[in-house]
């Protein structure tokens, strides 16, 4: 039964992470509907690593494309590659906001903002924001010609995804569309921007909730991680 629960968590997480819907909200709703435990922020952040692995695999040619770079050292490539710099800049807001909330008001985030009412209200606001984005004029900005200010702005909206009910992919894609991005590249940048954000969230939760992970056990977490990876590949 324990493994089936983690398989369910992984399926929900993987299928909803890359759709403009909140994976946290769906995990919460289905947990209530089935009468099982809410995975909580720690477990949710951990199984999200499966989504990161799926992004790395799907965009492996973009991430590990060193063709034509043979005369340069890999470190130089990473420091000067425009896309990687954009991802770094876009990650700054969620590090600052997420770190501040986790350090100074962790109980407010975990208890108040994860309430059913709070998630429902945030989801309604999120739906309205996505409607505005979908109704906005189609733009021509893409990954190759965007500014670093675009990266920071999208990263700012990504930081709001620490609040349950906000879809990380939904709010980043929507903010990019409103800013004038082309739809396909908006989605692509959103997925790539999620890699460091999701990874850092999992690391922070592991540090702050080590005892919880230890009590769950390695195998159930691994099952959830693998399930998330496979379902994320289907969703991408």
Give the positions of each predicted feature.
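Multi-pass membrane proteins that catalyze or facilitate reactions on polyprenyl-/lipid-phosphate substrates
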Residues: 1-236
């Amino acid at each position: 039964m324990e493994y089936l629960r983690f398989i369910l968590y992984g399926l929900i997480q993987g299928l909803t992470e890359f759709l403009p819907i909140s994976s946290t909200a769906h995990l919460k709703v289905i947990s209530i509907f089935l009468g099982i435990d809410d995975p909580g922020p720690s477990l949710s952040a951990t199984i999200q690593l499966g989504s990161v692995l799926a992004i790395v695999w799907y965009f492996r040619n973009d991430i590990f494309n060193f063709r034509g770079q043979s005369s340069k050292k890999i470190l130089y490539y990473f420091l000067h590659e425009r896309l990687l710099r954009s991802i770094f800049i876009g990650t700054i807001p969620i590090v600052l906001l997420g770190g501040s909330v986790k350090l100074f008001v962790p109980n407010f985030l975990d208890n108040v903002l994860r309430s059913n009412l709070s998630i429902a209200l945030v989801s309604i606001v999120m739906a309205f924001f996505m409607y505005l984005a979908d109704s906005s004029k189609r733009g021509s900005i893409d990954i190759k010609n965007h500014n670093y200010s675009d990266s920071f702005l999208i990263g700012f909206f990504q930081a709001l995804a620490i609040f349950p009910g906000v879809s990380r992919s939904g709010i980043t894609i929507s903010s990019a569309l409103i800013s004038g991005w082309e739809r396909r590249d908006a989605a692509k940048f959103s997925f790539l921007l999620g890699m460091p954000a999701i990874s850092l969230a999992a690391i922070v939760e592991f540090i702050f909730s080590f005892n919880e992970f230890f009590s769950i056990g390695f195998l159930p977490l691994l099952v959830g991680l693998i399930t998330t990876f496979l379902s994320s590949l289907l969703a991408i």
